[in-house]
């Protein structure tokens, strides 16, 4: 492996059709596209010069580019803005990529290998995506346009998520307060959507079985369906129920809609909040105090969404007993 400290106008390295590319910068936008050959290329977009502090490592089938002075660790630098600076990146379509920008936007088009994309305050947009895709952002929105089939893992705090087109073989989607719109065909799974207060819209005319664990949220379908269960734990079956999806939320709703709604503009961007059947103001003081402890632990990261919903469901069950 060789390491460069001087930054040329364009960084090029042959990594092969299934090689590896890693790019970590602080506040540049990243624009990725498939290359016509097996060479990875990185340059400043629109004639911009590359950052002068890049550290470049070339391996037999890999290229790594990093801003060590601006990107000291895995944590993100919040509050900075990209200011219109962009890196244009070409990479073989089936290469494995790992790209991170602390505050810049990331866009990718036509990539089909293992993809890991991460930003803190920027947006993520993938077009004509296939392969295994992992995306993560804190406050930015995530948009995934699928071409062919994809395995998808999505994590965001306050950003909204949109997935459309193609076929999603499996999905694990977690958000705190962002809303979710999933209109792609679903494969065999497993499929899971987890939110705290975010709502989810799912388009499907195929058989679905949705199992929901929620505290104050609701589960709805515009299609003919059957449902069972009560507050806290419910299931909803559309058609033959062949495809299973797990939904966990504290107060978010999930709604199944007919794909015909996609063609006439009737898909809402968010669901109208549904009032809980029992207001927390009417709960005993000790139950409300316990509820606040659970929610604060979730907010601080001490527990995850799954554990929080289980604890809250247990709390409500004890209250109703």
Feature map (PLM): residue ranges:
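Intrinsically disordered, low-complexity terminal regions
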Residues: 1-321
